[in-house]
Swiss-Prot record:
The keyword NADP does not apply. Keywords: Cytoplasm, DNA-binding. This is Nucleoid-associated protein TTHA1599. It comes from Thermus thermophilus (strain ATCC 27634 / DSM 579 / HB8). GO terms for cellular component: bacterial nucleoid; cytosol. GO terms for molecular function: DNA binding. Pfam families: YbaB_DNA_bd (PF02575).
């Protein structure tokens, strides 16, 4: 493969990666913990919303640390799902190169 062709392919891959990044900004995932807490994040893992069911406040009324743990679990779940979504979208668009790029974002 000559240098010009390689450069063109790299530019196409870069453009596709940028398009995926824009899509991920609009895509959302939801992480949860015991059905009491939900965390919504975009495809980059940025937290967009946090929802507590009233039962969560009642169940952890005397255990604020337990509620904090539940929140962390839901946040981590949302971020894990966002990371998996990012890898999947990059791989779908760019194949093996996409998987490498997905790990970077």
């Amino acid at each position: 493969m000559n240098f010009q062709k390689l450069l063109k392919e790299a530019q196409k891959a870069q453009k596709k990666a940028a398009e995926v990044q824009e899509r991920l900004e609009r895509m959302t995932v939801v992480g949860s913990a015991q059905g009491l807490v939900e965390v919504e994040a975009n495809g980059h893992g940025k937290i967009l919303a946090l929802r507590l069911k009233p039962e969560a406040l009642k169940a952890f009324q005397d255990d604020p640390e337990g509620l904090e743990d539940l929140l962390l679990v839901a946040i981590q779940d949302a971020q894990t799902k966002a990371h998996e979504l990012s890898e999947k979208e990059m791989a779908k668009e760019l194949g093996g190169v996409g998987q490498m790029l997905g790990k970077l974002f």
